[in-house]
Amino acid sequence: MTKSIIASEPPSAESSGRLPWKILGQTTGFPNQDQELWWLNTAPLLNEFLAECQYDVHLQYQYLTFFRHHVIPVLGPFFAPGTTPNFASRLSKHGHPLDFSVNFQESGATVRMSLGAIGSFAGLQQDPLNQFRAREVLDKLAILYPTVDLQLFKHFESEFGINHADALKVAAKLPKLDRATKMIAIDMLKNGSMTFKVYYMVRSKAAATGLPVHTVLFNAVQRLGSAFEPGLSLLKQFLSPLCDAGETDLGLLSFDCVPTESSRIKLYAIKQVGSLDAIRNLWTLGGTMDDPTTMKGLAVLEHVCELLQFGWSGDSRVQPILFNYEIKKGSTPKPQIYIPLADRYDEFDAAKLKAVFQDLDWKRVPFYQDTGKDLASVL
C-alpha cells in the first residue's frame, strides 16, 4: 500500500510538534535547497508511516537519520507536481523517485521505501538512462552494511547494462518513463536492521538488443545456471506464450541483496483481466499448481476480492492487473497479485482490510483492533 510522497503543503510547526523528522531537520541542516525541499515534502510522511505502524521513537530517529543521510542526497533536483524533471522515475505517474509503502504480514507491518536514485547527469547526454547512481548507492551500502551482498547485482548489471552509444539511441526512442533502468527497495525492520532489494526495468535493454522483453529477462536468469530451478522453467513455459501473443507484459525483475543461494528472484508482469477465473489462472499457472499452499493462498485472495467488492461484470470491468512470481532454488513459483485500489474510498477499503486481518488472525498487525480510520491514513 502506497501513498503520494509530495505533500500539498509543508506541515506547520504546530501540527508537527516535536516529531523526530522536525527535530532532525532543524539540527542537521542541508547543503542545498533541493535536499531541504525533498526533506520537507517527504520526511513527515515517512515519520507518519513509522509511527502508525508502531515503530518506537528510537527506531523512528534511526530510520529518519538513515533517510536524511543516504536517501535525500540521491533524489536529484526537487520538482513539484506539474513540472517536468530531466529524468522521470517509474515509481510514480508523476516521475517522482521515491515511494513509501507498508507490507502487512502475520508478523506485523513493515515500512518500506523504494528509491530511484538520480545521478547528476541523469537524462542528459552523459547518462541518458541514469545507469550509474544506483550502482554508487549500492556500493556505499555494501560498505556500511556488511550483510549486503552484491553478487546477483553484478550478474544482472552485466546482463542489463547498456553502453553509452546504445544508451543515447535508446533514450531517443523511448518515452521518459520507460528510460529508467533500476531502483532500490529498503525494508526497515523493527529489530533495527534493514534488508535491500534491487529492481531492474529492462525495456531499454530490449530496445537496445531488438529482443522481446521477456526473452531478455528469461535469458538473464537462465545464465545463472540451475540456481532458480525448477521455478524458472515453469514460469517460462506458462508466461512465454502469453507474452508472445501480446496478452501479458513482463518487464520487471527484482532480487534480494543476499547470497545467490538464499535470494529470491521475482518476475513482475501486467495482464488485462476481466474475471475471477482469469485471476485463478494466473495464480495457479494455468492450473498446473494445485498444492495446498497455493490453493490456500487462492482462497484468501478470493475472500479479499469479495470483501473489497472487487468483481467483474462484462468487458467494461476489464483492467490491468499487476502480478509477480517469486522463485527460489528447489521450489515452485509463489504468486502474488496486486489488487488496484486507486480512486476508491480509503476508509471503506481500510475497514474491509481490517476484516481480512481479523479473519486471518493477524494480531500483530497494528490496525487489528482499530476502527479502520488509522489504517486509512497509510492507504
From Swiss-Prot:
Q: Which family does the similarity line name? A: Belongs to the tryptophan dimethylallyltransferase family.
One biological-process term from Gene Ontology?
A: alkaloid metabolic process
Q: What is this protein called?
A: Trans-prenyltransferase abpB
Give the EC number: 2.5.1.-, 2.5.1.35
Q: Give the function comment from the record.
A: Trans-prenyltransferase that acts in both the aspulvinones and butyrolactones pathways. Prenylates aspulvinone E and butyrolactone II to yield repectively aspulvinone H and butyrolactone I.
**Species whose genome carries this gene:** Aspergillus terreus (strain NIH 2624 / FGSC A1156)
Q: Which gene encodes it?
A: abpB
Q: List keywords of the entry alphabetically.
A: Transferase
Which transformation does this protein catalyse, written as a reaction?
A: aspulvinone E + 2 dimethylallyl diphosphate = aspulvinone H + 2 diphosphate; butyrolactone II + dimethylallyl diphosphate = butyrolactone I + diphosphate
Q: Which PANTHER family match?
A: INDOLE PRENYLTRANSFERASE TDIB-RELATED (PTHR40627), PRENYLTRANSFERASE ASQH2-RELATED (PTHR40627:SF3)
Pfam family of the protein (one): Trp_DMAT
Drop me one GO molecular function for this one: transferase activity, transferring alkyl or aryl (other than methyl) groups
- Record-annotated membrane-spanning stretches: none
* Pathway in which this enzyme or protein is active: Secondary metabolite biosynthesis
Q: What happens when the gene is disrupted?
A: Leads to the accumulation of aspulvinone E and butyrolactone II.
Positions binding substrate in this chain are: R90, L91, R112, K197, R264, K266, Y268, Y338
